[in-house]
């Protein structure tokens, strides 16, 4: 789909408060486009946009798009949205975020990070290495980087590092120069319908990578291995713990606040090379894989091992990725975005590896009824490394469905499959009461979820 854009257009973002939409809006504003938007409620992303003089209306209303000439819609926007319907009625051009993103980055050399999990951290790690190498890239990420306090920034070079969004299939329209596939998991089934359809989309994405670029695919994921059989251009390299990986992880050491590892590089045209004593200030094997993806792409464009290692060592992290918020009774409280069984398992595995003698208390807010119902078996086993799970009410994320799902039954299944203590709470006051009565001694607390749980954790000290 070809998009014709003039700087005189008034481009309206429906659902501008999402992390991906807000990042794209900010970049387009800095490129000189006339941007405005709307969302159902205020948040930190919207406040950041307002500081950049982007007009935003809270609430969706057809009057909001009265003077608009182009509409960009979030994947979270339903077809009965009043602004969407008004735009259709007035025959305004309507584009998905991924379509507009593809247009913006099509004239840049880029690194596109795709996958079910780990995209945000991987995008951030690649960006940090590029910055260390004095390649000032444009960055469009799915999380706020602590190094510059935003999810997006306009760079001075002709490079763009961006995180894709697979939720509506539009990521296949982004033309990558270099592409990364972290993993493929059962997500966004409401759109794809089956894991096979999802895998086929990733095949298209990888096949879009040109001969002068390269794809980097993690070999530690079964679904990733499956798509290798279908990729037609064969222009890819692999990474991971798997011994067949072109960039193989080994000699892993994890401490409380950092990880050290080595990489063995085996390329078809060269003799074996090694990058040793790579240090990252984050924990978990999943993050070591993310860092290895960043090493692979950076090495392939010619960045030196020293600059790669410096970029990783000085990484300042991403908000809501195992972020320490406060301590109570000397017990640390962390906030994490994990909301899928695979993500939860990986975070807890990493925490257990370095906090071996601590009891793990997980405060979990499920995100979407449909996800919990469709993956209830996987969820019921995901918390095996935790000692206590505090279950918060489901964050519905706009879903007005019941699906005949009983939350209390899920709690029972969690107890049965993971053999852990499960406590149901109804609100923040319940959480404060639980904390006062139970959080002390040799414990570590992690809030998990993609909804409002981050606010619950951050506001908890005021209730204690």
Segments the model singles out, each with a brief description of its role:
Residues 2-12, 20, 24-31, 255-257, ...:
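Nucleotide phosphate-binding/pyrophosphate-handling subdomain across enzymes
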Residues 380-441:
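C-terminal helical cap/extension that packs against the catalytic core
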Residues 11-16, 448:
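Conserved N-terminal Rossmann-fold NAD(P)-binding element of oxidoreductases
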Residues 33-48:
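NAD(P)-binding Rossmann-fold cofactor-contacting core
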Residues 2-5, 13, 20, 27-33, ...:
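Phosphate-binding loop of NTP-binding sites
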Residues 55-66, 150, 430, 435:
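Short acidic low-complexity segments
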Residues 38-39, 57-60, 95-99, 140, ...:
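Beta-strand->loop->alpha-helix junctions that form or flank phosphate-binding loops
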Residues 34-37, 138, 390, 423:
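Conserved beta-strand positions in the Rossmann-like core of class I SAM-dependent methyltransferases
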